[in-house]
Amino acid sequence: MPSDPPTRPADGLRRAPDADIVAGPSRHPVTVAADEVDAFFTTLGFRAHQTPEIEDALHTFDLLGVPADHPTRSPAHTYYAADGRLLRTHTTSSVLRVLRREPGAARRRILVGGPCYRRTTPGPRFVTQFHQMEAAAVGPEVGLPDAIGTSLALLDEMLGDDHGARLRSRALPYVSPGFCVDVPCAPSGCDGCTLCGGRGFVELVSGGVFTAAVARAAGVPDGSTATSVAVSLERLLAIRHGLADIRPFLSPDPHALAALA
């Protein structure tokens, strides 16, 4: 099957509802961060693809091995349309879509990104619309160390090499093993901090090795492995600016956004 022509995920971010509100030459801070992440992965040979914000349960849940009774499938957590389609809840569904366009490719490096949506009460750490970018690599030589190394190199690029990141395992339905990378929460020394919830660290990156079932669903051939690395842009920006809240980056106030650009 021919693939769609690659496009920059930052283009999709500029079309997000909050992405064009700053008048004049200023650029939205989320767009700036997206372009920086895009540039980082481009230097590593990843190709960016545009993907839809309107998804289906097949790519969002079923093919990723999300159990039928998982809370994220509930309308209490996900925005559903009357026809059963839904607003994208994470970018891994987009990764799956792009990989399935060229089944059987032994080696690939792709990048997707854009707005994601979840039903929640907006707060310092969780909001109804947020932005993710996710890179996936496929190849016989690809493995978990590559995904971890790429994650740490990305944080070096975005935050400097003194970010103090820690690595821990994380259970996700579609990866095994899975991991995440946390960074120290700078704003308030943890006591009463609304970004880290008093834990002292904030999760910025998650990823892992796709399970055999997910790899087959994505069209990854036998002998190749697929990994993914996803980063939260608003959380990344909050750490970069020393804020204990991601909501300022979704503000409709152009003056407040200009100060964060």
Specify the residue positions occupied by each region the protein language model found:
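TRNA-recognition modules of translation machinery and tRNA-sensing kinases, especially anticodon-binding
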Residues: 2-261
